[in-house]
Each structure stands twice: as structure tokens, then as C-alpha cells.
Amino acid sequence: MRALVDAIRAQGTVLPGGILKVDGLINHQLLPQLTREMGETFARSFGPLKPTKVVTIEVSGIAPALATSMVLGVPMVYARKKRPVTMQGPVYTAQSVSRTKGGVVELFVSHEYLSADDRVVVIDDFLASGGTLLALAGMIRESGAQLLGMGCVVEKAFENGRANLASLGVPVRTLANIVRMDEGGTLVVEAGH
């Protein structure tokens, strides 16, 4: 996605700890046209698989997942990182390490919104090591739903997340690929795949 690659090149900043700051694009401020294009691109990739749900993780995955679900015309469900008092009844849970949150996060999805009848596409903001996506895939598997594919806005190719997701046996689509980055200012971005 050329517009996204250009925007990351122009606005992306590398922070200590291997964190890519793109909060003016996808994590804090959202650009409507760019977000719409993300959804359209993911929908073209995954629409032929006939998903019934788009699933993501709060918070930064919500915008691209919602844009995708709007194009596909299917509901979007997001895993919560804290169980609210309104989440009554049984839930699927998983744990994952979050670099940006600085520790382990627990994920929650109500049984009410994910079932064995669902055909799921996961859309999220980043693919780094793949740990959080593997945790979410485990929740989907536990529900009996069929995981059809995963899409991530930005992939940090050097963290091997794609290889870690290979065991899932589903297509993985990314929109921008960070080939190399360092705190000295190096940021090499290519189109995703």
C-alpha cells in the first residue's frame, strides 16, 4: 500500500526498545482516507474466503479491523485487555506479552460473540514476533471457529513473526514491511505482502 509506506517513511520514528512510533497514522491519530484504504485492501485479500467475523485486539487494531469489516459487511469483535463488569458469562482468555504495555496482558472475548459457526479473519496493527496473534488464534481455535487468515498493517520482518505464524496454516497479509530500523534513524520500509 504505497500511501501507507510513504506516510511511514515521512512520519515514522524509531524509539528505544525497537518500538516504531507511527501514532500519527494508526495508533493515536487516524487518517480517514488511509484507514479506509487499509480496510479496502484487506477486504480484497480476504473477501473471497467468505469470513463471517473480523477479530482484533484493542486498541490499535480496532480502526483497521472496523474499516475491513465495513467493506466486508460483517461484524467486528475485539479482544479486551481488561475484563469489564459488563462482560457476563463465559469468556475465552489468553495471555500475551506486550512490548508497548511493558508486560503481560490478558485477552478476553465473550463466548457470545465468537462461536464454532464463525469464519474469522484477524486484522491487527502490527506483526512483530507474532506472540499476540498466536494468543488470539488460540482463542479462536478454542471457540471452534475457523481461522481463515491474518492481516497486519505493519510488519517488522526482522522479528520473524511471519515465520512464527506459519504453523497456523493461514495466509498472512501485511500492508507495509519494515525491513530494517534502528535508533540511529535508519528506517527502511517496503510494500507489504
From Swiss-Prot:
Pathway: Purine metabolism; XMP biosynthesis via salvage pathway; XMP from xanthine: step 1/1. It catalyses: XMP + diphosphate = xanthine + 5-phospho-alpha-D-ribose 1-diphosphate. It is an enzyme of class 2 (transferase). InterPro entries: PRibTrfase_dom, PRTase-like, Pur/Pyrimidine_PRTase, Xanthine_PRibTrfase. Gene3D superfamilies: 3.40.50.2020. Coiled coil: none annotated. 5-phospho-alpha-D-ribose 1-diphosphate binds at A128, S129, G130, G131, T132. GO terms for molecular function: xanthine phosphoribosyltransferase activity. GO terms for cellular component: cytoplasm. It is found in: Cytoplasm. Xanthine binds at L20, N27, K156. This is Xanthine phosphoribosyltransferase. It comes from Deinococcus deserti (strain DSM 17065 / CIP 109153 / LMG 22923 / VCD115).
